[in-house]
Amino acid sequence: MTLQEEIIKELGVKPIIDPKEEIRVSVDFLKDYLKKYPFIKSFVLGISGGQDSSLAGRLAQIAIEEMRQETADASYKFVAVRLPFGVQADEEDAQRALAFIKPDVSLAVNIKAAVEGQVAALNEAGVEVSDFNKGNIKARQRMITQYAVAGQYQGAVLGTDHAAENITGFFTKFGDGGADLLPLFRLNKRQGKALLAELGADPAIYEKVPTADLEEGKPGLADEIALGVTYNDIDDYTEGKVISDDAKAKIEAWWNKTQHKRHLPISIFDDFWK
């Protein structure tokens, strides 16, 4: 088995999907979790305005609505959380996403004070924080906030990790990489777009240039520039297609370099890192 085949197997990506079928798979997955753990009464998700959180958010809202209808339990809620750092340049995109998702509850928590406070405390201790590391603090602060909200709403936190992101490790460890459920796992970027189109999303949501937008020195830096490879190549790779040697080498290098992000903390019984 080639490394490409091993990765595809681990990520569970299909070369061809039926968007309607995959929507149902994700919705049922979320509902099954609520049925298994009846004390969980909500799903919580941070909404950025991009493709991934828009899709995960809409799937969660559908699952919650179906649970309310099937159980007659009105306490089930989906909580969408806006988590801007100061003034978000693409706030219009975030509002467009919320209009599409139609969440039961919509909150806005500005993380700037918390992040700047952490950076100031580190500086006071003699630790200089780089722009890159500050970006990771932002991602982790957003997850701290989501878990605080989930604690108040008897909720589980959703993540937006998907195959095209997971394969490159393009997420912050214990930041956006930390969640309870991943309804998009197994889908690559173009497949996520297909699901959004099926759900009737405004094309502006899934045609938006993907960006983590964590570094202040590189505002709005496109994912593809940061990674050095296109999502089209990543999607082709995860679907088992032949891509250029250069793109393949970059993707597999990211996979190997970020392997630690796909595991729980390493114990003496783990050998994947050796």
UniProtKB/Swiss-Prot annotation:
EC main group: ligase
Q: Where is the signal peptide?
A: none
Q: Which GO terms describe its molecular function?
A: ATP binding; glutaminase activity; metal ion binding; NAD+ synthase (glutamine-hydrolyzing) activity; NAD+ synthase activity
Q: What transmembrane ranges does the database entry give?
A: none
Q: In which pathway does it act?
A: Cofactor biosynthesis; NAD(+) biosynthesis; NAD(+) from deamido-NAD(+) (ammonia route): step 1/1
Give the matching NCBIfam families: nadE, PRK00768.1
| Function description | Catalyzes the ATP-dependent amidation of deamido-NAD to form NAD. Uses ammonia as a nitrogen source.
User: What interactions and quaternary structure are annotated?
Assistant: Homodimer.
**What is this protein identified as?**
NH(3)-dependent NAD(+) synthetase
Record the organism: Lactococcus lactis subsp. cremoris (strain MG1363)
Q: What is the lineage of its organism?
A: Bacteria, Bacillati, Bacillota, Bacilli, Lactobacillales
